[in-house]
Design a protein with these regions (language model features):
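Generic preference for hydrophobic/aromatic residues in regular secondary structure cores
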Residues: 6, 12, 18-21, 39, ...
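Short, charged N-terminal helix-start/capping segments
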Residues: 3-8, 15, 25, 29-35, ...
């Protein structure tokens, strides 16, 4: 879960002396969490909560509002903005306006934005998603037999236990179901049913 008792969290933890904390009264670090040297925690736009045993590694940037779940790791040099990260996740690269549920990994460089990622998902190195159309029109997402108008910014919805290969390109407003194994060159289809395999969804 996402720490149901976050406001009961023992927030007496601190960051390394070389870190920069902006609006530090809105930065809540668990006593058992570690915020490593050179990291920046910017709570100008919302609170930042670093939960029990989480690690924000060297030189990472976290802009609030943000929640880093129990036992999760934010990799060195990562850039996170407006995120909710569940427990036991490993997150690197650039992530914004996105939820990662527990036990999901995006360890390497690549951009994921305006997206919703289930549990036990693994995104291979340099997996990227688009979240804005070139003509700035609203994004439509197919869910089952219906299409939903998701507004100007919408990335991807990825179901539990799905994996992507290295350098996977995910189009604007893409739906990927449960238990998929996605790989191959070029943009993936915008609707990938559960248990699909490969670039052609076979």
């Amino acid at each position: 879960g996402f720490g149901e008792d976050i406001y009961d969290l023992d927030c007496k933890g601190s960051a390394h002396e070389s870190c920069i904390l902006i609006n530090n009264d809105r930065v809540h670090i668990s006593n058992s969490a570690v915020v490593s040297a050179g990291s920046i925690l910017d709570a100008t736009d919302g609170d930042i909560i670093i939960d029990d045993n989480a690690l924000v590694d060297i030189g990472a940037l976290v802009k609030g509002p943000a929640y880093i779940g129990k036992n999760s790791i934010v990799n060195p040099g990562a850039k996170l903005k407006d995120v909710a990260i569940g427990p036991f996740c490993k997150i690197g690269g650039e992530v914004e306006h996105t939820t990662f549920h527990g036990f999901s990994n995006k360890q390497h460089d690549g951009y994921i934005g305006n997206s919703y990622i289930g549990e036990w998902v693994n995104l291979g190195a340099n997996t990227n998603n688009s979240d804005l159309k070139n003509n700035y029109s609203n994004v439509r997402i197919r869910i089952g037999d219906n299409e939903v108008d998701a507004g100007m910014f919408a990335g991807c919805l990825i179901g539990d236990f799905t994996k992507t290969g290295i350098s996977t390109m995910i189009n604007t407003g893409t739906y990927i179901g449960l238990g998929c194994n996605i790989f191959g060159g070029g943009f993936q289809k915008k609707y990938i049913p559960s248990f699909s395999w490969g670039a052609d969804g076979e």
